[in-house]
Amino acid sequence: MDSLRPADWPGESFCYTIRNQTDLKNERNPQMTHNENEFQGFFAEFFDMLHEGCEDAEQYVSLLGTYGKKILELGSGTGRIVIPLAKAGFQVTGIEFESDMISLMEKKDYPRDRLHVVQADARHFSLDERFDVILLSCNFLNHFADAADVASILSCCRDHLEPDGCVIIDSSVPDTDYMVRSNGEEEVLTFATENGSEIRDYFKPCYDFLNQVENDTIRLQEWKDGVLIREACTEERLTWYYPREIRSLVREAGLRVDWESSALCTKEDRPPISVDSENMIFCCKHT
């Protein structure tokens, strides 16, 4: 599961522009508007289109070759990481909670004998096998604000690791400057799709800095030829972890940090996590 936060959008998959809200027809049709989970329905489709072709999938393919062939990803979504891994020859299992995300993945072309997805809650999963690598990629942990939930997730990961296996946690370093600038401000982005329609994304983050919580209000509209085709609204709640917190959570789960870096790359090229880093990667093993 990834966030729909603008700072995380790659931009390669869509032609998009940022416009002021006053530049757009901010029309709403109450009969068409409905609330959705941020990983269901319209939002699941938007997520899938938005993250298609992200470069981190190929980075994982390159990185994981030295760690073994059995891979588990928590929050595998519509398959943007697990499918490239399966195509590269890895034996891959995904855990995904949302059925709409799984349905979108199953429509894609991938080797069925090397990838299967289990619909389950990552906080309490139990599989009858162990893995060489377990991935918590793309801000997966940020969707769990309760420390007890994170502890349960990491404990489940520990119990499903091979003796020399590793858990890889991939999260964004909190961008406090962006948070301060954007707090309470609605941003509107427009995306031109392949079928000639335009998706308008109205995104408003509100930050609770004391508790490191982000509450987002998101509204999606799809327009074609000046007509509003569909509209959906959602709210998401995220939390943001700093490196010291990740290290502590890992240690409390009975794991240790084997290495950490600000980029997904081989040992020789790993840059350290610093104040200028956008990402933080932790490779964790049994104690």
Tell me the role of every PLM-derived stretch.
Residues 26-69:
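Conserved class I S-adenosyl-L-methionine
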Residues 168-247:
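SAM-dependent methyltransferase
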Residues 123-133:
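A short acidic, Gly/Pro-enriched loop at the edge of an enzyme's catalytic core
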Residues 80-124:
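Class I SAM-dependent methyltransferase SAM/SAH-binding core
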Residues 237-287:
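C-terminal lobe and adjacent flexible extensions of AdoMet/dcAdoMet transferase-like proteins
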